[in-house]
Regions:
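A conserved beta-strand element that flanks and buttresses the S-adenosyl-L-methionine
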Residues: 114
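A short, conserved alpha-helix within the catalytic core of class I
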Residues: 121-134
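Short amphipathic alpha-helix with an adjacent loop that forms part of the alpha/beta core around
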Residues: 98-108
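Conserved class I S-adenosyl-L-methionine
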Residues: 35-43
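Class I SAM-dependent methyltransferase Rossmann-like catalytic core
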Residues: 1-32
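Conserved Class I S-adenosyl-L-methionine
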Residues: 107, 199-269
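Conserved catalytic/acceptor-binding region of the Class I
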Residues: 139-204
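Class I SAM-dependent methyltransferase SAM/SAH-binding core
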Residues: 45-98
């Protein structure tokens, strides 16, 4: 699995929190039987910081199990979350193999299995395995901010559609879990959990980025340009021209970017 550094995670956290569906999070929280939560690809603990206010007091002291490939991110999470009520446990795990037999079921005993910005990176096989492990444990699930392929930029540029299409092709490259689901991930997850008897709900959770998020916009534009050139080297000049103009819009305070995401919650009756 490709890593994400702490600076990037901190940069996106405020936009993530604004975009997420509070209604969907509240709906799944109301259905929890306890407060044991498994957070997959937890990074520095942003998911905990978002979710903690939704857990009902009658569930008891929360127990958070944060799992990630990167021990350094987990160490930072432990520091940032050290004053939280309840138990915060971190565990460095190779997530690409964590669901394969004979590995123990990470989901066992967990009231909620959750992740943020993960599902579009994983493969059909991995996500099917996760759905099976969650069903075996009868865990509710909440998956936030799954990229759905939507990118809209204004002011418009002639290459916007080309870059978006190249980025979406790049999203399907193996990210360490096998061929990535990319923009198809949320729909595939809905089918996988429904097939196992889950009630599934989805809500949009788009990033709406304006002049209050210039650095995040800059990082996105540069990352998208790199991805587009990796897929189509012959388009390097066009992509670089697009990048220069898009960054100029950001610098001038006139750039608006919408990035499509979906939140998904599911539970067993």
């Amino acid at each position: 699995m490709g890593g994400f550094n702490a600076d990037w995670l901190a940069l996106r956290e405020p936009s993530d929190a604004r975009a997420r569906s509070a209604a969907l999070t509240g709906a799944i929280a109301e259905r929890l039987a306890g407060a044991r939560v498994l957070d997959l690809a937890a990074g520095t603990g942003a998911n905990v910081r978002y979710l903690e206010g939704f857990l009902r007091g009658d569930l008891g002291r929360p127990h958070w199990l944060l799992v990630d490939n990167d021990p350094a991110l987990l160490a930072k999470a432990a520091v940032l979350l050290g004053s939280r009520e309840g138990v915060v446990e971190t565990r460095a795990v190779d997530l690409s193999a964590a669901l394969d037999p004979p590995a123990a079921n990470l989901c066992a005993g967990q009231d909620l299995v959750t992740a943020s910005a993960l599902l579009d990176l994983v493969s059909e096989r991995w996500l099917n395995a996760l759905a099976g492990r969650c069903a075996d444990a009868r865990s509710a699930v909440l998956f936030a901010l799954t990229y759905n392929g939507g990118i809209s930029c204004s002011p418009g540029e002639p290459e916007d559609a080309m870059v978006r299409d190249l980025v979406n092709r790049h999203q399907r490259i193996d990210k360490g879990f096998g061929p990535a689901l990319g923009p198809d991930a949320a729909a595939f997850a809905a089918r996988a959990f429904a097939a196992r008897g889950y009630h599934v709900r989805q809500e949009r959770s788009d990033w709406l980025l304006a002049d209050d998020a210039p650095f995040l916009q800059q990082q996105l534009i540069e990352g998208w340009a790199d991805a587009a050139v990796e897929i189509a080297p012959a388009e390097t000049l066009r992509v670089n021209g697009w990048k220069t103009r898009r960054l100029a819009h950001v610098d001038a305070g006139r750039s608006r970017i919408v990035v499509g995401h979906d939140d998904l919650a599911a539970w067993l009756a």
